[in-house]
Amino acid sequence: MTDKIIQQLEARINDLECQLAFQEQTIEDLNGALSQQQLQITKMLDQMKYVVGKVKNMDSSNLADPSEETPPPHY
């Protein structure tokens, strides 16, 4: 092989190594973001379950019958 071909191959290998390093960092960053989002989703699901439970357990006797409500003022 000539020196020129060897230099081209070395340059190509160097470029591929740089791309691989960048992709590895990107995968690590995406994995961190995904893990954080999963924690947020889990927390929101727990909060929704709590709110749904509260709504289901609300005492409907605190609400007046619509027929007993005074009509809203008309402008």
From Swiss-Prot:
Annotated signal sequence range: none
A Pfam family annotated for this UniProt entry: SlyX
InterPro entries linked: SlyX
Alphabetized HAMAP family for the sequence: SlyX
Stored PANTHER family: PROTEIN SLYX (PTHR36508:SF1)
Family, similarity comment: Belongs to the SlyX family.
Listed name of the protein: Protein SlyX homolog
Organism for this UniProt entry: Vibrio campbellii (strain ATCC BAA-1116)
